[in-house]
C-alpha cells in the first residue's frame, strides 16, 4: 500500500523541478526533526530492527548497514530524522569550510528512463561553522558521518588548510568523517585524488579529529589509480574508502543522447553507475579489503544488488537515488532482504558475508 502511494506521489513530484521538490522534502524533514512525537511515530513503523543487521564498525555501532549517502542533507538540518525512516546512519554534507551557493540553476535533473539523477550542484552549503551549529542541536545519538569537500574559491594549493578547517569544526560532532575528492562538480577537485595531493589532505584531517577518517573516490578512476589510492589509504592508516561517487560517463543510457546533452555537465547517480561501482568495490576488496572498511554506494536499487555489494566486500552501504525512486519502503526492503539472505546462508552476522562472494538465493 505504501509503495503504491509513493508511486502516485512520485508522479506528482515529477511535475515540479527536482530542486524545488528537494526543498519541499527538506522542509518536511525539518518538521519531523522538530516534533519529537512525530519522529518517534515514524520510527516505530519504518526501521527494520533485526539484531542480525547490527554491526560494530571502526568502533561505531551501526544498527543497520544501509545509510543515507551524502548530498541530501547538506547542512545537517534533519540529522535525527534519517534513523526514524530506517537508515542505519546518515552521511551529511558535502560541507565546505566556507559557505558557498554552488553552481547556477538549473543544476539537478532526472533521468527516469534510467532511474538516475544528473547533478552539478557544486557543494552548495551553509559552511562548516553553520552546520556545526545545527549539529549541536541534535536530539538523538543516531549515527552520522560528515562528508567534507574543498571550497570552490580556494586554490588547490591551499586545499590542505581548507579541509583542515572543516575537520576542526565538524570532526567532534560526527561518528566519522569522509574526505570528498571525487565530485565532478568542483573544478580541479578530482585532481586531488592523485596520491601526492591526497596524502597531505588525509594527514591534516587525521591530525584535526579523533574520529575515523575515510576517503570517497570516483568510479571513473583507472584501475591503476584505484590501486594507488588504496595503497595510500593503508599507508596512512585511514579507516576506510567509500566507493563510489557519481560518474561523468554517459555510456549505456536509455535517455536519448540529445536530452542528456541538453542537461549539460554533471555527475550521474543511480542505476547507470551500478556496474562500475561494483567493479571498483571488488578491486578494492581484492587489494586492501582485509585492512580497512569499504562502503559500497552507487546504483543500489534492489535487495539483491545490496547483497551483491556485501558479498563483494562492502561492510556498509549507502544510497540516495534509490530512495528518490523507491521511497521509504526501499530502505526497509533492502534491510529485510539482507537479513533474509544472511539466514538463507546460515550466517549470524553481516561480517561473515563481507567479501564471501555468496550468491543471492532468494526468489
From Swiss-Prot:
Record keywords: Cell membrane, Flavoprotein, FMN, Membrane, Oxidoreductase, Pyrimidine biosynthesis
Any one Gene Ontology cellular component term annotated for this protein: plasma membrane
CDD domains on file: DHOD_2_like
Enzyme kind, highest EC tier: oxidoreductase
EC number(s) stated in the UniProt entry for this protein: 1.3.5.2
Recorded coiled-coil stretches: none
Family annotation (InterPro entries): Aldolase_TIM (IPR013785), DHO_dehydrogenase (IPR050074), Dihydroorotate_DH_2 (IPR005719), Dihydroorotate_DH_cat (IPR005720), Dihydroorotate_DH_CS (IPR001295)
Pfam families, per the entry: DHO_dh (PF01180)
Gene3D superfamilies the record matches: Aldolase class I
Reactions that this protein is recorded to catalyse: (S)-dihydroorotate + a quinone = orotate + a quinol
Cofactor stoichiometry and binding remark: Binds 1 FMN per subunit.
Molecular function per GO: dihydroorotate dehydrogenase (quinone) activity
GO BP, sorted A to Z: 'de novo' pyrimidine nucleobase biosynthetic process; 'de novo' UMP biosynthetic process
Task performed by this protein: Catalyzes the conversion of dihydroorotate to orotate with quinone as electron acceptor.
Protein family per UniProt: Belongs to the dihydroorotate dehydrogenase family. Type 2 subfamily.
Subunit structure: Monomer.
Name of the protein in question: Dihydroorotate dehydrogenase (quinone)
Gene designation: pyrD
Amino acid at each position: 500500500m505504501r509503495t503504491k502511494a509513493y508511486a502516485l506521489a512520485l508522479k506528482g513530484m515529477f511535475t515540479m523541478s527536482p530542486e524545488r521538490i528537494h526543498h519541499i522534502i527538506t522542509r518536511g524533514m525539518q518538521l519531523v526533526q522538530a516534533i519529537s512525537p512525530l519522529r518517534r511515530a515514524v520510527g516505530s513503523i519504518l526501521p527494520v530492527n533485526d539484531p542480525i543487521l547490527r554491526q560494530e564498525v571502526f568502533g561505531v555501532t551501526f544498527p543497520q548497514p544501509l545509510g543515507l549517502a551524502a548530498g541530501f542533507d547538506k547542512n545537517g538540518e534533519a540529522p535525527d530524522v534519517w534513523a526514524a525512516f530506517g537508515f542505519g546512519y546518515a552521511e551529511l554534507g558535502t560541507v565546505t569550510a566556507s559557505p558557498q551557493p554552488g553552481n547556477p540553476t538549473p543544476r539537478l535533473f532526472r533521468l527516469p528512463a534510467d532511474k538516475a539523477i544528473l547533478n552539478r550542484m557544486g557543494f552548495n552549503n551553509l559552511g562548516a561553522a553553520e552546520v556545526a551549529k545545527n549539529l549541536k542541536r541534535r536530539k538523538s545519538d543516531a549515527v552520522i558521518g560528515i562528508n567534507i569537500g574543498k571550497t570552490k574559491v580556494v586554490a588547490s594549493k591551499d586545499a590542505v588548510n581548507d579541509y583542515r578547517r572543516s575537520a576542526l569544526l565538524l570532526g567532534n560532532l560526527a561518528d566519522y568523517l569522509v574526505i570528498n575528492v571525487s565530485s565532478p562538480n568542483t573544478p580541479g577537485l578530482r585532481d586531488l585524488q592523485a596520491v601526492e595531493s591526497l596524502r597531505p589532505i588525509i594527514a591534516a584531517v587525521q591530525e584535526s579529529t579523533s574520529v575515523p577518517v575515510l576517503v570517497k573516490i570516483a568510479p571513473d578512476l583507472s584501475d591503476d589509480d584505484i590501486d594507488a589510492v588504496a595503497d595510500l589509504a593503508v599507508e596512512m592508516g585511514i579507516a576506510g574508502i567509500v566507493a563510489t561517487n557519481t560518474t561523468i560517463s554517459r555510456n549505456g543510457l536509455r535517455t536519448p543522447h540529445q536530452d542528456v546533452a541538453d542537461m549539460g555537465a554533471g555527475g550521474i547517480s543511480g542505476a547507470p553507475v551500478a556496474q562500475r561501482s561494483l567493479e571498483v568495490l571488488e578491486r578494492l576488496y581484492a587489494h586492501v579489503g582485509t585492512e580497512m572498511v569499504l562502503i559500497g554506494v552507487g546504483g543500489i536499487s534492489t535487495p539483491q544488488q545490496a547483497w551483491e555489494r556485501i558479498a563483494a566486500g562492502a561492510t556498509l552501504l549507502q544510497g540516495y537515488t534509490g530512495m528518490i525512486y523507491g521511497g521509504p519502503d526501499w530502505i526497509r526492503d533492502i534491510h529485510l532482504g539482507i537479513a533474509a539472505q544472511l539466514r538463507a546462508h546460515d550466517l549470524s552476522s553481516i561480517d561473515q558475508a563481507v567479501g564471501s562472494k555468496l550468491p543471492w538465493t532468494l526468489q
